[in-house]
């Protein structure tokens, strides 16, 4: 199974740098990474070009003119350009656990999509990570976590327990952490580009 990691970004190069660095440490690499850029300035382009020099997999920068919030359109363009059979989608202000791609591939099943969650970090911890540019682990006891601590646990038995506990509350996709088959995405014509928000809910 060939995978494409799609990263959505808009004018947050400092966060994107940390995100791309976290891709380097994956236990299983995606076959390619596409940065879908909704109109960022040249600072983002320069950053991506610097990463291309020694990035472990092909790194592709797709850019569209800044005409307001057009994330759905950019994501559709990114999936259209992808060569992977399986798409993993995140936001550019996410930095990944080192088994992130491995987990998505392991759990992929025909006819299903995956919706993950995230650990929300406070402003101080976020700034520290962006400034240090050091890939680090986040634990349930890490100071600066703003949402449920269990989202920082990487353990299959524990994850299964909380998946059963919260599954009835999951009603839609989450663009910062979801994956799906490219063929399924194309079959439903992708995201609704007329929506300014909630396009993931309409798709799933």
Predicted regions and their residues:
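Short aromatic/hydrophobic "clamp" motif used to bind/position activated sugar donors
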Residues: 87
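Conserved donor NDP-sugar-binding/catalytic core segment of glycosyltransferases
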Residues: 99-140
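Glycine-rich, basic loop-to-helix element that forms the pyrophosphate-binding segment
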Residues: 65-82, 99
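Short, well-formed alpha-helical segments that are part of the catalytic scaffolds
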Residues: 12-25
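Short, flexible, basic/aromatic active-site loop/helix in glycosyltransferases
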Residues: 122, 134-170
């Amino acid at each position: 199974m060939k995978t494409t990691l799609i990263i959505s970004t808009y004018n947050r190069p400092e966060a994107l740098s940390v995100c791309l660095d976290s891709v380097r440490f994956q236990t299983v690499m995606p076959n390619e990474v596409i940065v879908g850029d909704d109109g960022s300035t040249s600072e983002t382009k320069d950053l991506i070009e610097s990463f291309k020099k020694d990035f472990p997999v092909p790194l592709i920068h797709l850019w569209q003119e800044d005409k307001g919030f057009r994330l759905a359109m950019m994501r559709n363009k990114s999936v259209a350009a992808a060569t992977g059979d399986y798409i993993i989608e995140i936001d550019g202000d996410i930095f990944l656990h080192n088994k992130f791609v491995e987990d998505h591939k392991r759990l992929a099943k025909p006819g299903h999509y995956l919706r993950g969650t995230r650990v929300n970090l406070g402003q101080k911890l976020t700034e520290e990570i962006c400034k240090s540019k050091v890939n680090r682990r986040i634990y349930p006891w890490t100071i600066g976590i703003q949402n449920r601590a269990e989202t920082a646990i990487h353990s299959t038995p524990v994850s299964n327990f909380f998946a059963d506990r919260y599954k009835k509350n999951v009603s839609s996709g989450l663009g910062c952490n979801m994956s799906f088959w490219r063929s399924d995405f194309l079959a439903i014509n992708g995201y609704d580009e007329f929506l300014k928000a909630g396009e993931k809910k309409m798709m799933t």
